[in-house]
Amino acid sequence: MKLAVILPAYCAEAYLPECLDSILNQTFRDFFIIAVNDASKDKTGEILKAYAARDSRLQVFHLPENRGEPFVCQFAMDMLKDVEVEYVARMDADDICTLDRFEKQIQFLDSHPEIDIVGSQATLFFDDQSGREPALSNMPLLDKDIKAFLSLASQNMFNPTTMWRHDSIKNLGINYTATETAPDFHMWVQCALHGKTFANLPEPLLFYRIHQAQESKKRDKINRSVQYTMELWISHLFPDLNATEVTLLSHILYEKQLRLTTEELKTIFAAYDRISKDRSISLFGEDRNTMFDMIDNFFNFLKSRLKFT
């Protein structure tokens, strides 16, 4: 088959039918789905079973206990290791694909052999009664800019919009369970460190659902996981930084909160002044001018707030 789709599902009964309908009714038909029910406590498993009975492209696996998204991703990727499939796509159980998503991304990858991973924009909509209007994401389109935005742990790749070349990624041996959560960001950093290339399509190919408490319940896990991956990325981007400087710079670029001591901030500013002098070097294809411009703006704002000179 041309495409495999990884679909983790946990307690998603309210959204799963709409998600599955959007996948199974794609204009591109040559794919199968690996849906992993992560020991859901609701009717997620029953919904998956019912859909699988109607469409043989849906393969369902039920975990006996809840293991979390990193384990589910590792489970699915391990299952695909020996499968002859050209591309792999990600999807989340509470989101909705446009019906031409797979067709457009496959056309792009078929015609751009230099790109390993492609995402797209997304329409963000709110799962509440607030009446807030949907919003359109503004992800960078080019590899050099996507890698620049990795340094802020934001606005790089929208995980449930992504599709990648199976042979290109499976041989990297990525450990998706290296972090407690946020395995997607860890994957993108690992891919960048191995010289893989990214692109985002300009059109929105996904409706991304934002619902209350979507991240609040696991905020500490997210912070620890992203910090771990940020340190991995920053340490390779700037090999001259020592371990303390890497940790502090990673922390403030991701969390962007003033929780550090004055001495820690002085350490960060001094380290940044040192590494930002030469902007001509690009170790992994990142646009350092774009990257440093973004960090400059943030640091200048920070210094003005703190009255640093």
Name each region found by the language model.
Residues 37-46, 65, 92:
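A conserved acidic beta->alpha catalytic loop
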Residues 15-17, 42-50, 96, 100:
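Acidic helix N-cap motif at the loop->helix transition within catalytic regions
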Residues 193, 198, 210-309:
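C-terminal subregions of glycosyltransferases and related glycan-biosynthesis enzymes
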Residues 63-83, 88, 104:
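Glycine-rich, basic loop-to-helix element that forms the pyrophosphate-binding segment
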Residues 12-25:
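Short, well-formed alpha-helical segments that are part of the catalytic scaffolds
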Residues 120, 140-232, 240-248:
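Conserved nucleotide-sugar donor-binding catalytic segment
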Residues 2-3, 24-35, 43, 55-59:
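Short loop->beta transition adjacent to catalytic acidic/histidine clusters or analogous donor-positioning motifs
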Residues 100-134:
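Conserved donor NDP-sugar-binding/catalytic core segment of glycosyltransferases
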